[in-house]
A protein has these predicted regions:
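Conserved hydrophobic/aromatic pocket- or pore-lining residues that grip, position, or stack substrates
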Residues: 176, 216, 240
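…primarily DNA-binding HTH/wHTH and HhH modules…
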Residues: 291-312
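Terminal helix-turn-helix DNA-binding modules in bacterial transcription factors
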Residues: 210-218, 222-223, 227-228, 246-288, ...
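N-terminal functional module of multi-domain proteins
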Residues: 10-109
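Alpha-helical bundle regulatory/interaction domains
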Residues: 75, 81-204, 209, 226, ...
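Polar/acidic, low-complexity leader/linker segments enriched in S/T/G and N/D
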Residues: 1-5
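Short hydrophobic/aromatic patch on the recognition helix
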Residues: 240, 244, 289-290, 294
Length: 312
């Protein structure tokens, strides 16, 4: 992973800055909008395994993340790791999180809202002043004792964020202001005690399961069982299953089925290899079982997929 670079472009007003990221194994784009004094909205688009940036240990900056596509992982200073799935939202202070993001599916699209609490409190959005909301209390509410708050996907979050991904440019500035106000009012109403928190995983657990993932995806013709992996890597089967799903979003079996089929789809588009050979390469000895699995995932037969995608 590579560090965050200087802005590639910045407008004359200081309203928008664009960062093009070389992540070592992929690329990323971060578009930063200064919506209010002390409040930024950042659009994140990554096709990479992760990204790093310069360390920022300001305990008075609150970071709110929303995952639109893919998965996003963060490592807390305690050493614990937590992961967001599609539609999830997280809140933490900048000083409680390592200056990096990981993307287990090598694809991530989401929005971050950064709030400098002191600056925002000095010049708050008008609606906050009118409602008597003290934005400084958000830190104690959501990040008490260094906690990170996670909210699972729900309709209220979807309502606030979904429209932000398709705002016409001519309306973007007033719309971002409106949506930031809506988000802050929504967070004011959240009852933290009623939100079930996501499991956090230790760094050693995460690194071990990532090694297992690497093993599983390196040779698709092999199909080790969970019990075999558990013995080989000295990890409890329940811990392996739970941690794998927490990182990658699916049980091992379902994840590997989809992974195999996605690899097969690439081969169908990019090569002239026969369907039978492709099935064998990704671990299906029976071509009819491969065809059935392919239809389950891609909703189309392999031969028809190759034809429609203009495969070689």
């Amino acid at each position: 992973m590579k560090e965050m670079s200087l802005p590639t472009t910045r407008d004359s007003e200081g309203y928008c800055a664009l960062y093009k990221m070389d992540c070592g194994d992929g690329l990323g784009l971060m578009t930063v909008y200064q919506v209010y004094p002390g409040i930024q909205v950042i659009y994140n688009d990554f096709e990479a395994a992760g990204c790093e940036w310069e360390e920022n240990l300001d305990r008075d900056i609150l970071e709110i993340n929303h995952c639109r596509e893919g998965r996003e992982g963060s490592r807390l200073l305690s050493g614990s790791c937590l992961y967001l799935g599609e539609g999830d939202l997280s809140i933490h202070t900048m000083d409680n999180c390592a200056p990096e993001m990981s993307f287990p599916l090598r694809h991530y699209r989401g929005i971050s809202v950064l709030i400098n609490l002191k600056m925002a409190a000095e010049a708050p959005p008008e609606i906050l002043s009118e409602s008597g909301i003290d934005i400084l209390k958000f830190k104690e509410k959501f990040c008490h004792d260094g906690n990170c708050f996670i909210m699972r996907a729900k309709d209220e979050i979807e309502h606030i964020f979904s429209e932000l991904y398709s705002v016409p440019e001519c309306l973007q500035r007033p719309y971002l202001k409106l949506k930031v106000q809506e988000l802050l009012l929504f967070l004011c109403m959240v009852d933290v005690s009623k939100e079930k928190q996501r499991t956090q995983y230790t760094s050693p657990q995460v690194e071990l399961v990532k090694e297992i993932h690497k093993r599983l995806t390196a040779n698709l013709q092999e199909r080790p069982t969970i019990e075999e992996l558990s013995k080989e890597y000295l990890i409890n089967t329940a811990t392996l299953k739970d941690t794998f799903k927490g990182i990658y979003g699916q049980p091992i079996g379902a994840y590997m089925k989809e992974y195999r089929i996605r690899q097969a789809a690439d081969l169908l588009r990019q090569t002239q290899v026969s369907i039978a050979e492709i099935a064998s390469q990704i671990g299906y000895e029976n071509q009819s079982k491969f065809a059935s699995a392919f239809r389950d995932i891609m909703k189309i037969a392999p031969a028809e997929y190759r034809k429609q995608s203009g495969g070689k």
